[in-house]
Amino acid sequence: MSPKTETKASAGFKAGVKDYRLTYYTPDYETLATDILAAFRVTPQPGVPPEEAGAAVAAESSTGTWTTVWTDGLTSLDRYKGRCYHIEPVAGEENQYIAYVAYPLDLFEEGSVTNMFTSIVGNVFGFKALRALRLEDLRIPPAYSKSFQGPPHGIQVERDKLNKYGRPLLGCTIKPKLGLSAKNYGRAVYECLRGGLDFTKDDENVNSQPFMRWRDRFLFCAEALYKAQAETGEIKGHYLNATAGTCEEMMKRAVFARELGVPIVMHDYLTGGFTANTSLAHYCRDNGLLLHIHRAMHAVIDRQRNHGIHFRVLAKALRMSGGDHIHAGTVVGKLEGERDVTLGFVDLLRDDFIEKDRSRGIYFTQDWVSMPGVLPVASGGIHVWHMPALTEIFGDDSVLQFGGGTLGHPWGNAPGAVANRVALEACVQARNEGRDLAREGNEVIREASRWSPELAAACEVWKEIKFEFEAMDVL
């Protein structure tokens, strides 16, 4: 019997409890190209050595349990166990370590984000030997990523469908998010699209409530976007939220959206679940629908620095599960997001190949082997004065969404949309002429407001509005 396949049954079984590090801490291990690699921020309980804590994470998220079991002898642990292969202290933090764990590919079902997370972030996060645990990053090998469809269409296909190039796309979340009738909701959609926006959006918690059932909303929104298209000559879209209480109901809503001929639907991927999201993404590719993804509930999982899952991991998981857009923070708005960290996972969403860069929180080089990219969506507390910064930070391949920054315009919804479109076009033109938006952005907006009364009114309303709080998610 070769060492690779030797079992404990052949060597004799000894019952009892032994340290995890004796089996699962392997500092000499050389990772394989097919391994899934994980970087965990580990905070051990007092008295627990970091090697034991890292090994416990590797064990409890793969083949291990709290005691030796005789059935270990019926398989090859060397083939299937996770391995903690490196540990390093976290600079500036007491009793925190980054534990690197390698998982053999055979531990995971092909094409299943659900199974991947059930293993890697399952019971181990409640393990008593750990005071706190955070999954900072994952390296998804090409051998595994190729088992996923990924985004239904991707960035280039979306631009071709919309016939829009050379600038960020503009959107707006309809407000108030709850309480409008379907007809009034459709009216707001029409006014925003007619004013110059590319998209309008259901808020994440708009599903099918008593004040507005989903079918009525879909019908009035479809009417609104077709009317706006006819008047502007531009292709328009509204993110029709298909999220529902069951997968069957979700698919029924997506089918109805396709029958209406609209270009895009929406899903809340964390509250809806990865299984539902992947099913919807497959339907969208097969039926020509774009898929907008909202990350509602993400901050419950990712906001604490020492416990949970970093959003860069949730972003990678979404690219695998499938989505053409995902909300990714704004850096400058009301929602959490530090610049370097945000741009790190924005690149992980959009690019084919991303080098390891710890200055941006990227722990591993990631090769997506031509999986379609995802457009990051900047949304939350942004207005026309933010347009230069947003254009400079996110670049062309992004969606900039102004909810209150459109519907809060003193002259109404359509003028609010006009103000945002004028501001965006002015920023793109200035950038293309070689001007520095980071330094000259405010002047670019002031110049444009001289010939756009809608923009001038918006500038006056929001000139003092800032959200200057310290970010929690910093390196």
Swiss-Prot record:
Keyword Lyase: yes
Pfam assignment, any one: RuBisCO_large
Modified residues (N6,N6,N6-trimethyllysine): 14
GO cellular component annotations of the record: chloroplast
Enzyme Commission code: 4.1.1.39
Modification N6-carboxylysine, positions: 201
Main localisation: plastid
Protein name in UniProt: Ribulose bisphosphate carboxylase large chain
Taxon lineage: Eukaryota, Viridiplantae, Streptophyta, Embryophyta, Tracheophyta
Gene from which the chain derives: rbcL
